[in-house]
Structures are given as C-alpha cells and as structure tokens.
C-alpha cells in the first residue's frame, strides 16, 4: 500500500511526486554526515508508447557522483492532485548504484550539467573551491582547477560549508565558494575565500578553447567570502558577498565592478539568483526570511540618477516587490526556473521549498517609474505569489534542514523539481497549483 502524501492547509498537493532512497554497490559509511548536492541532466527522451518522458538526476554524496534515471508522465492537464507516490524510479529501487564519476579526495558541493555529447559532460566544485570537469564514459576528472590551502589560509573559512541559516551573524563569512557559467557556457567565474584577513577572490576561467585555464583573478575588496556568483548573459555577471553588497561585473572590462547594489537592511544577504529567461530579473534572499525581486535595469539606472541625491546620498535602488518566509525561516538558496521567466523557488533553513510566481507583482510594476516604492508583502500579494510549499511528503525525515545546491529545477521539463535530503532520499515532484487544473 503506497504511503500517502503529506498535506497541510498550505498549497502542498502534488501533480506528481516520486522518491528513492538509493542503494549502493559499495558500503557507504556515515551517510547523514556526507555532503550532498543535486542537479539534472538536460537529456530528455519521450516515450509515446508509455506516455512518459525519461531523463536523469545527477546526485553527489561525498566524492561520489551518481546518475539515476527516471520516467515521468508526459505533460498533461491534471484534473486533480495525486494522493499517492508515483513510480518514476520504478526498476531502480532494488538496483545497487555505482558512482558514474568520482572526485577522489574531495567533497562535492555543487554540480552543473554541461553536454553529454560534448568535450565535457559535468562540472563539479568541491567544498574547498576546486573545480573538476568530467566526460561521459570517464570516471575521473579530465580537467581540474585545484585550490590548495596555504600556510596563511584559514581552514575554517575555506572548508566550512555551514548553512547560512545556522550561523551567528558574525560567523556567516565562514561559508561558501561558488561558481557561475555564462549563458553560452564558454566562461566560468568561481569565487574563493582567500583566508580570514584577506579579500575574497573571483577567478575567470575558460570553458571553451582550454577548459580550466585561469584567464584572470579579481579581488573583491572588503570581503572575506563571496558566496554566490551568477551570469546574466555571456559577459555580465554578479557576485554576492558577506558585506551585503551585490557587485556587477563584465568579463571584458577591468577588474572593478561596473555598478553595485548595497543591501544594508533585512539581515545577512545569503542568496541570489537571476532569471535565465528574462536576463533582467533577479532575486535576493536574507537570513531573516525576506525575499526581494529586482529589475537589474532599474537598479543600474539608479546609480547614475542624481535627481534626488545632489548632496552625495546613496542611490535610491528599490526592489520591485518583497516577500517573506513565514516564521522568519532563513533563505539559504534561491533558484529561478529554467523554463519560466516568472517562477522561482526559495529554500528555507527548515528544508521547506517555497515556490513563487511573480506575475502579480510584475503586473503592477512600471519600469519607467524609477522612484516607485517597492510593493510590500501584503497578505494579498503573498497569497497570489506563494503558489506552493514543498515540505517533502511522508517519506521525508522531520529533522531535514535546508542546504544550498540540494534542490534544482529540471532544465527542460516544466515545473519539475528534484531534491536530495541528508539521509540520501532523492525526490522529484511537480506542484499541483491552480495552473494545473
């Protein structure tokens, strides 16, 4: 008898949900204490006979990286939410898995799927900031950018991957390295802690002609850690640091930001992502549970608009709208959908995943009104924008907590999200919302 899906008064019913607790060929010790991360393959194979789409989830545990196939029903209008778990992982439940790739001696903290048929298939980052490129059919990395600890490097600052939501205010800087990939996949920017007393650094790295070649190193002054890096297009990217400042850069220009956005209020700026579809929208998340939606064009224009600041005041950079996690649940990750310009999810320190739709806020937004106050998180806007809350279903541990890079949108299949929990439970789901009806 299938277990029933967990329900509450919030929108948490599913169009589809399946989960798998993997078995492994080799014994895996201390599963709960091993770092996990998750992404999807972009390969999708339709099966008209069975009315399914087959793809795969890429899941890391410590130094081992696994590929797990799944099949979900073809996109159809759902008449009602499901009551039971699906069988997307049918045939895999009793299969013992062997690693597809191994980053020996490292703990994988983030992955990005590149191209199954290309020179490189998967890019992974270890928790000390090293990068490794893997190719289909080869178990070990074919390129590596290694980060070694020097005598002046703080072990804590470079190796601690503690959740931002768990850290005291003063210790948030002991967090994270990250990387971003340009839209054409030809350039990578990685962030790196450089030790307690030194600036964090950005490395601009070739991913085309000579994958792994460091093209330039940029210091981010006044910061200990730059925890998030994201590209808006092929050249413009932004970095988010522990001084609560977003810096916007151009890989073609000098080693100084082209403009900045300061966020001194609302707690620590813990997460940031930009839309892969619009190129203008981005979202910031805070340790206090506050979420802000921004228009990059308006925020940049405000830096040169002196109309209301003739005496040297800071730029008036207002977000489009703000939202919040109930109960002050900290924002530990945020990701825009790869298939929709208006949808993103946030991950709370509780492990809950909040699905947001920005259509309501954008319908009230006038980009030409440069001094309009932000749309505050009223009950109406919160209700219309928070479309779904994933608490994980009945199979998830009640002790689950939120971590970066453990949830992901599928890059091709609309509204499909994957997660991995501390106990290795891998789940994929599609929310059931009003749009599903």
Curated annotation (Swiss-Prot):
| Nucleus listed as a keyword | yes
Major subcellular location class: cytoplasm
The Phosphoserine modification is found at 200
Q: Which Gene3D superfamilies match?
A: YVTN repeat-like/Quinoprotein amine dehydrogenase
A Gene Ontology biological process noted in the UniProt record is:
positive regulation of transcription by RNA polymerase II
* GO MF annotation terms: histone binding; transcription corepressor activity
Q: Where is this region: Disordered?
A: 368-404
Identify the GO cellular component terms for this protein.
Answer: cytoplasm; nucleus; Rpd3L complex; Rpd3L-Expanded complex
| Keyword match Transmembrane | no
Q: Where in the cell is it found?
A: Cytoplasm; Nucleus
Each WD repeat, start to end: 103-144, 221-259, 264-304, 326-366
Report keywords, A-Z.
Answer: Cytoplasm, Meiosis, Nucleus, Phosphoprotein, Repeat, Transcription, Transcription regulation, WD repeat
Q: Where is the sequence biased in composition, kind Basic residues?
A: 387-402
Assembly and partners are described as: Interacts with KAP122.
In Swiss-Prot or TrEMBL terms, this protein is called Transcriptional modulator WTM1
**Highest lineage ranks of the organism?**
Eukaryota, Fungi, Dikarya, Ascomycota, Saccharomycotina
Write the gene name.
WTM1
